[in-house]
Design a protein with these regions (language model features):
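PLP-dependent amino-acid enzyme catalytic core
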Residues: 1-435, 439-503
Length: 503
């Protein structure tokens, strides 16, 4: 099978629709990493991602009579545009089943390329199941987004281009993993010709289906999947892609949301282009790898695999990028409620730039300060904590606390003497009409909402934090509500920031 993929990649038909994208030097990132970082700019394709390669290579090889009947696909994003463009170029019809939660900009992009959009279900799994039903009902050919040899071979042409474009030593190639089609194709080609090059996969920490599968030795289906990097939000990897990754992937690096946002900013500073979160994963991993391995003078290649970014997500990315780069730290500091305390606190900060400063009296003796400070590195933040505490100011470092970053820094208020039996939970729910109403109406009318915060980040999924007063004897009913709701949730009742500012 190894040689079969080599031949399939060498003979893949992708250049009717795809361009050979440049392999660009990233000067700022390279200087910071003390290594040469090259970006494979798949974000420069006409559909702003690599997906048209595999889709076209699959469809162009269908028998004419089969192709004439049309194709169908399920996708919430880049694969949909690739299939629509390929169908348009080949003169056939394409039906794309997309979840009803799909942002309008992506629906419009598919329609602009001639695809007939069918909105069905709330998740990719719902859309996939319905697409397979329509496949049989209408006699169409299903174009899988990753688990198909022709799709894998089409994506593998990226590996072929990389080795042709850069013939000097390469330490590692970093590739984002969703279902695994991209890294399988690149790995199958590169490892055949240059086996010394490391193939390193990248997944979000909350969408790590391939990482878990490789550790388990079999495919693992995730019960929940994070959606910030929606282009790789896959619950279960492909059967063929899993087999290929077992053979060709050297390791998988997991990256968090903040580091992904920082990578988006890094690429913007080097190229003035904005990648989508999935498109920036490889860059985030290359940075983490270089720091972990303490390497210098090596050539690292990161596949910038997509740029279908919703504009209204940029606010969230900008806020979290500084945290991902360790250029901002967030602290909760308790100071004495007396004259001169704030001045003494500010003297501890010195000449550092503040990103925010919130002060609230807590009681007769103490007050709480929520402060964001620009820092040079993580060691700088540790030093600040030591300085605060040396002056007798009790300090919490909240830089890595999700509740703080998503909600508390945007909230006002304080402790309420009326919030008896309050429970605090974070929820993630689809951004669709009626989703919030479902949440509220599903609760018992006997439960009082004592705290609520929602902020639209321009993503397919929204995030809320809710304080709900539930009597102790109704805790079993509360757990049943959580289980029935079907949304991801996090228990934040023991969160120190909540206890300090709101609990």
């Amino acid at each position: 099978m190894f040689c079969d993929y080599l031949i399939q990649i060498l003979t893949a038909r992708v250049y009717d629709v795809a361009q050979e994208t440049p392999l660009e030097y990233a000067p700022n990132l390279s200087a910071r990493l003390n290594n040469q970082l090259l970006l494979k700019r798949e974000d420069m394709q006409s559909v702003f991602s690599f997906k048209l390669r595999g889709a076209y290579n699959k469809m162009v090889q269908l028998p004419p009579d089969i192709l004439a009947k049309g194709v169908i696909a399920a996708s919430a994003g880049n694969h949909a545009q690739g299939v629509a463009l390929a169908a348009q170029r080949l003169g056939t019809k394409a039906i794309i089943v997309m979840p009803v939660t799909t942002p309008q900009v992506k629906v419009d992009a598919v329609r602009m390329r001639g695809g007939a959009v069918v909105l069905h279900g709330n998740t990719y799994d719902d859309a996939y199941s319905y697409a397979r039903e329509l496949e049989v009902e209408k006699g169409l050919t299903f174009i899988h987004p990753f688990d198909d040899p022709h799709v894998i071979a089409g994506q593998g042409t990226i590996g072929m281009e990389i080795l042709r474009q850069y013939q000097q030593p390469i330490h590692a190639i970093f590739v984002a993993i969703g279902g695994g089609g991209l890294i399988s194709g690149i790995g199958a080609y590169v490892k055949r010709l240059r086996p010394e090059i490391k193939i390193i996969g990248v997944e979000p920490v909350d969408a790590d289906a391939m990482s878990q599968s490789l550790k388990a030795g079999h495919r693992v289906r995730l019960s929940q999947v994070g959606l910030f990097a929606d282009g790789v939000a896959v619950r279960e990897v492909g059967e063929e892609t899993f087999r290929l990754c077992q053979q060709y992937v050297d390791e998988i690096i997991l990256v968090g949301t903040d580091h992904t946002c920082a990578a988006i900013k890094d690429v913007f500073e080097d190229t003035r282009s904005i990648l989508e979160p999935a498109g920036a994963l490889a860059i985030a991993a290359a940075k983490a790898y270089a720091e972990r391995e303490q390497i210098e003078g090596q050539t690292l290649i990161a596949v910038a695999c997509g740029a279908n970014m919703n504009f209204d997500r940029l606010r969230f990315v900008a806020e979290r990028a500084e945290l991902g780069e360790r250029r901002e730290a967030i602290f909760a500091v308790t100071i004495p409620e007396q004259r001169g305390s704030i001045r003494q606190f500010c003297e501890c900060i010195g000449n550092r730039n503040l990103t925010e400063f919130n002060y609230r009296i807590a009681d007769e003796k103490t007050a709480h300060i929520f402060v964001g400070v620009q820092i040079q590195n993580r060691a700088d933040a540790v030093k600040m904590v030591e300085t605060f505490e040396a002056h007798g100011f009790e300090t919490l470092d909240l830089t890595d606390d999700e509740l703080t970053k998503l909600h508390l820094r945007h909230m006002v208020g304080g402790h309420s003497p009326l919030a008896h039996n309050e429970l605090l939970y974070r929820f993630e729910f689809p951004e669709r009409p009626g989703a919030l109403m479902k949440f509220v109406t599903s609760m018992s009318p006997d439960w009082n909402i004592s705290l609520f915060h929602y902020r639209n980040n321009g993503a397919d999924y929204g995030r809320i934090v809710v304080g709900i007063q539930v009597p102790p004897h109704e805790m079993q009913d509360w757990q049943a509500f959580l289980d029935h709701l079907g949304y991801r949730y996090w228990d934040e009742n023991k969160n120190p920031a909540y206890k300090l500012f709101l609990g």
